[in-house]
Amino acid sequence: MVSLGGIARKIFGSSNERRIRGNKPRVAAINALEDSIKALSDAELAAKTEEFKGELAKGKTLDDILIPAFAVAREASRRALGMRPFDVQLIGGMILHENAIAEMKTGEGKTLVATLAVYLNALSGKGVHVVTVNDYLASRDAAIMAKLYSFLGLTTGVIVHGMNDDERREAYACDITYATNNELGFDYLRDNMKYERGQMVQRGHNYAIVDEVDSILVDEARTPLIISGPLDDRSDLYTTIDAFIPMLSAEDYEIDEKQKSANFSEVGTEKLENLLKDAGLLKGVSLYDVENVAIVHHINNALKAHKLFQRDKDYIVRNDEIVIIDEFTGRMMPGRRYSEGQHQALEAKEKVTIQPENQTLASITFQNYFRMYSKLAGMTGTANTEAEEFQDIYGLSVIEVPTNLPILRIDEDDEVYRTFEEKFKAIIEEIKASASRNQPVLVGTTSIEKSELLATMLRQSGFTDFSVLNARYHEQEAYIVSQAGVPGAVTIATNMAGRGTDIQLGGNIDMRLERDLEGMEPGPERDAKEQAIREEVKALKEKALAAGGLYVIATERHESRRIDNQLRGRSGRQGDPGRSKFYLSLQDDLMRIFGSDRMDSMLQKLGLKEGEAIVHPWINKALERAQKKVEARNFDIRKNLLKYDDVLNDQRKVIFEQRVELMDAEDLTETIDDMRHELIDTIVRTHIPEKAYAEQWDVAGLKTAMTGILNLDLPIEDWAQEEGIAEDDIVERVKKAADEVMAEKTERFGPEIMAYIERSVLLQTIDNLWREHIVNLDHLRSVVGFRGYAQRDPLQEYKAEAFELFQALLANMREGVTAQMMRVEIVREAPPEPTLPIMHGHHEDPQTGQDEFAAADGIVAPENRNPADPSTWGKVGRNEMCPCGSGKRFKHCHGALLA
């Protein structure tokens, strides 16, 4: 039966088709301008940029100039890059400009499509960020596309790991900036830990185009970026607790692979309590007494380390370190760590050096970072399966852009075997058969362990002519993938390794030329070699086409259909022929954890012999249903996490905006005075309730508060004895006394040093309280889930209590700032300034506990200091000569304060 929706779509077309159709008149208008634009000289074409900027300054919008701007960008691309965007690529550029995701298949030129929207939006002068998944792609794309942007008079910058603040600031100041999502997020967090506006590197969040948008905004969405500092070493405790786990039997714990959780049974808990008592680690009677919370946390981590985390699948051991493996790409992530002590538990399990834990100093999720942009767009080959999530969370619609040429790839039905061994034997035979007919083969595996198992089995079968691409061989990744289209080539790759590098039949000509011509001087010999390479690649392409194009063999289905589609999409680029097939077994993770019992019983009834497979469209549909369930569950998890993170995000925005205002303010005296007066009002009215009799006043408590908080020794007892005195009189007298102290300090220190002190005290107090607040919210979030058992909504409870904690933070800020300002003194000799903790940047997945430490180098002192401008000084050591040029040490000059 045809649905009403289906009938409507036949008559009116889908929203996707309408969006594509709606842009075709603009494409026609751009094409109509082509001849006149072509007639312009290079200088005249480049001058169009200033002309467009002038039109925007006069009130025109970007939409008003889209048609001529796209026409100019297309012609400039032809001249600078030798590439002319197709009509469908123009449509892709329009979709990116319209705050949407352009779904474009592999090989359709997404990088070139982005240049159209980038050029148009860069004309506003507010900056455009092009976001990639790794430094290699950011550097590669920036280097190539800078030729185009430079031709048009625009500047291009790139941010990669290891750059200092000056280099980053310069790159962000460019019209177009290429960077990874990690670098952008960490720079935002680091900027909001700076003490001078001039030290910040970013200049706002205007427009971002996210390449591989599904990877960044979905796969990594629930993974916060965290900057942290190390805590005390507790390696002995991890080692002691790790030794308990091998003593347990299967009845002592329960493992849930679906939820990735591990818990102890009653029997296991009793056994652990005895072990902990013997080790002197158990306090009180029960393991679950309040004082044992930390020990329970350590034990749970140790259990997960042994029972949920697999070596060579989730991590590898290298150079005395645990190195995490990205579950989506199979790549190593050196320097990244699991959070909440999980990484230390793995280090104890594998008997490597246990690194100290870390305290969160600042954090943000990608969901909330990218929602800060005024305009956001994305590109990928596979977004449709996550269309609801993109719309729900980011307000981004997914538009499928037609391919320039029809897709000729044949996607075959899955083959299902009973065991791993049978499946791998069938794959090996298929690889050999394909290689014998010169068909290039890309084999996708889900883990290092599986890729190396397949490689070993291939060698044992006598077949050795293949390449293995997994986390262990990360350095050669791009080149190995680029040559996977050579006739007869067999490439085994973990999951989506090499994503972002095109697999061209015959091999990637650009990468071949770059590699083979490296170091050769320009001249006849180099030209001859280049020509020979081009002819060789052309002949190889014809041979690969004749063999049927790239054959993608998948050894397992991923729990996300999108990852499967990405693997399939490596074949059949730009109208090339191709083929894809999934080989499965009942022992695969997806089949074992999520597959239905019905499928298992059906295969048993069929009585399959060893080595036989079943192939039926019904199996594909059953697996797709299982994948949809997993995707829906993961979406719900991400959506729920976002609701909690939004609470923190709202508070983060208030604090970060407040910091910027404080850095920008010329005079903070009024702010400090208001804080002090509000605090005095609160203190007095706490100890002298409104309309209370004098004998009900807490005079002793008020006296203690005045001394302890305000550092004032006032005759409170005498005042209280005065006839007819009221609380308002006390408030005014205390304010007057405090104001006199501060006025005397200002006169003694001088206005310049006082302004420096005020700003430093305010920012340091906010930062310290904010770090404590993050820890408090983490603790609240970890316990609030249990409120559901009492029929209370955990989210509403979290919101209410988080608000109370935030109000307490603001009150503590008033008290902390006032207490420090009332005590601050310039001294002749100050104790050495405590060093800041070494800071690390990393990701943390709240579900798996995964961290991704991408080293954050802390606050880098600018090298060029202007003596007259303290904002350029950065962090100055107390024993350094003062940058102001006075000839005194910093601690005796501008740094001469003891808070």
Curated annotation (Swiss-Prot):
It is an enzyme of class 7 (translocase). It is found in: Cell inner membrane; Cytoplasm. Part of the Sec protein translocase complex. Interacts with the SecYEG preprotein conducting channel. Has a central role in coupling the hydrolysis of ATP to the transfer of proteins into and across the cell membrane, serving both as a receptor for the preprotein-SecB complex and as an ATP-driven molecular motor driving the stepwise translocation of polypeptide chains across the membrane. Its cofactor is Zn(2+). This is Protein translocase subunit SecA. The gene is secA. ATP binds at residues 89, 107-111, 502. InterPro entries: Helicase_ATP-bd, Helicase_C-like, P-loop_NTPase, Rhodanese-like_dom, SEC_C_motif, SecA, SecA_CS, SecA_DEAD. One of its GO terms (molecular function) is ATP binding. It comes from Allorhizobium ampelinum (strain ATCC BAA-846 / DSM 112012 / S4) (Agrobacterium vitis (strain S4)).
